[in-house]
């Protein structure tokens, strides 16, 4: 299901990079994504270019989440980067700024879909849903990774390690991770003891120990080996 973003947690201001062909937020000695891929596509006549990324392939619990983001080339937030390289506080600030200054779509594939389809196909399904929910539709996609989901309706390019190369993909990675982290905090309140507010469902020692002691919840992925073994006492 495609969704709008969760309520913002206060407005924040970060500087904007207003030039198309530069490294937004580039600091000396640091490598950050830039607008070069998007600028090359714009030179070919593509107007609405969406970056697409997903988060949550590795966790034992919770959905996989994808985001699609169309940036305004005149208002690109400074500091966009691979979400894993940013602090949670920085991601939260950029999340709110992106919702205010870009077109953003978020979608999920559920635990049930992950178990029925496999995690790769479920990840692609979430991406397809996020893209389909963009209105107006994009005319080109930059997809993080080396595979292009089969169900997309417009041209796309797969970009390996794209969240470190393209600001549009970096923006999508920030949006997807922030949404999913918030979701796992909410689920942690419903199912205390697994540490989801800290580990986001990933197989940390704390999480695996809680699985042994507390058992499997409806939000655990039964097709994942660690969960399957505990569920069926293998």
Curated annotation (Swiss-Prot):
The keyword Cytoplasm applies. It is found in: Cytoplasm. Its cofactor is Mn(2+); Mg(2+). Manganese or magnesium. Binds 1 divalent metal ion per monomer in the absence of substrate. May bind a second metal ion after substrate binding. It comes from the Bacteria. Endonuclease that specifically degrades the RNA of RNA-DNA hybrids. Belongs to the RNase HII family. This is Ribonuclease HII.
């Amino acid at each position: 299901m495609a969704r709008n973003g969760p309520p913002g947690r206060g407005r924040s201001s970060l500087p904007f990079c207003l030039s198309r062909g530069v490294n937004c937020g580039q600091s000396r000695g640091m490598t950050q994504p830039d607008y070069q891929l998007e600028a090359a596509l714009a030179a070919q006549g593509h107007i609405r270019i969406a970056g697409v990324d997903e988060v949550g392939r590795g966790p034992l619990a919770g959905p996989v989440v994808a985001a699609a983001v169309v940036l305004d080339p005149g208002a690109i937030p400074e500091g966009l980067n691979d979400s894993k390289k940013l602090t949670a506080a920085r991601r939260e600030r950029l999340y709110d700024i992106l919702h205010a200054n870009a077109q953003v779509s978020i979608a999920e594939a559920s635990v049930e879909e992950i178990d029925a389809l496999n995690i790769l196909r479920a990840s692609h399904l979430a991406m397809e849903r996020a893209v389909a929910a963009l209105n107006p539709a994009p005319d080109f996609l930059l997809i993080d990774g080396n595979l292009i989901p089969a169900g997309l309706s417009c041209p796309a390019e797969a970009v390996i390690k794209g969240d470190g190369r393209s600001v549009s993909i970096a923006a999508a990675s920030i949006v997807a991770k922030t949404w999913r982290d918030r979701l796992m905090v909410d689920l942690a309140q419903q199912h205390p003891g697994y540490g989801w507010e800290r580990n986001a469902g990933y197989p940390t020692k704390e999480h695996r120990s809680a699985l042994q002691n507390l058992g499997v919840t409806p939000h655990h992925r039964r097709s994942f080996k660690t969960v399957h073994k505990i569920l069926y006492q293998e």
